[in-house]
Amino acid sequence: MVFRRFVEVGRVAYISFGPHAGKLVAIVDVIDQNRALVDGPCTRVRRQAMPFKCMQLTDFILKFPHSARQKYVRKAWEKADINTKWAATRWAKKIDARERKAKMTDFDRFKVMKAKKMRNRIIKTEVKKLQRAALLKASPKKAAVAKAAIAAAAAAKAKVPAKKATGPGQKAAAQKASAQKAAGQKAAPPAKGQKGQKTPAQKAPAPKAAGKKA
């Protein structure tokens, strides 16, 4: 790309830093390789010498003679409508957006985040619709498969498993039923001994003799 922004008489420049930062001026005369005589009659910048390092050249050029007086510079500026043209450029819009972003609060940043999420969601749904329409238009076989997949997904989404209700009344009824069931069960009968078997009787000990025989 050919460079076209040269230092010349009538070139409009943007002041990037200094006491007049953010304003536009027109180059009236070139003093030397480091400085130029500038004037900004419509931006409240008086005629003065300014170094090139604090200026950024724009694409706008005014037509007025060398070292012209301020009234001629003002007339050329208003005729070219520089302020309106500058406000419509991407450069000026970026500067304005940067300034507005620096002044934002936390709530403003939150609102911007929510708006971006909503925008992305809308874009995604529209893209999916266009893709589906293109797929249906491309081949009838794929269209049938896509329709079946969409119907299956909708049916699966609509079919929600019913959860068992566990309210206090139902809990009490369940506990009562379990208690009745436990009461109705019979205790297991004790184990019986085998038939024909008798328990052995214990013999009483024999009394001792009163005396010994002679």
From Swiss-Prot:
Molecular function GO labels: RNA binding; structural constituent of ribosome
SUPFAM superfamilies for this protein: Translation proteins SH3-like domain (SSF50104)
Stretch list, region 2 X 3 AA tandem repeats of K-G-Q: 192-197
Region (Disordered): 158-214
Coiled coil: none
InterPro entries: Rib_uL2_dom2, Ribosomal_eL14, Ribosomal_eL14_dom, Translation_prot_SH3-like_sf
Phosphoserine: modified positions: S139
Residue positions, PTM N6-acetyllysine: K79, K85
Ranges for the Sequence repeats: 170-174, 175-179, 180-184, 185-189, 192-194, 195-197
Domain of life, source organism: Eukaryota
Sequence positions bearing N6-succinyllysine: K85, K203
Gene Ontology annotations of biological process type: ribosomal large subunit biogenesis; rRNA processing; translation
Alphabetical list of Gene3D superfamilies matching this protein: 2.30.30.30, 6.10.250.2270
Pfam families in the cross-refs: Ribosomal_L14e
Cross-link Glycyl lysine isopeptide (Lys-Gly) (interchain with G-Cter in SUMO2), where in sequence: K124
4 X 5 AA tandem repeats of Q-K-A-[AS]-X: region residues: 170-189
Keyword terms: Acetylation, Cytoplasm, Isopeptide bond, Phosphoprotein, Repeat, Ribonucleoprotein, Ribosomal protein, Ubl conjugation
Location of the protein in the cell: Cytoplasm
Cellular component annotations (GO), alphabetically ordered: cytoplasm; cytosolic large ribosomal subunit; cytosolic ribosome; postsynaptic density; synapse
Summary of the function given for this chain in its UniProt record: Component of the large ribosomal subunit. The ribosome is a large ribonucleoprotein complex responsible for the synthesis of proteins in the cell.
Family (UniProt): Belongs to the eukaryotic ribosomal protein eL14 family.
Known partners and oligomeric status: Component of the large ribosomal subunit.
Protein name as it appears in the record: Large ribosomal subunit protein eL14
Organism for this UniProt entry: Rattus norvegicus
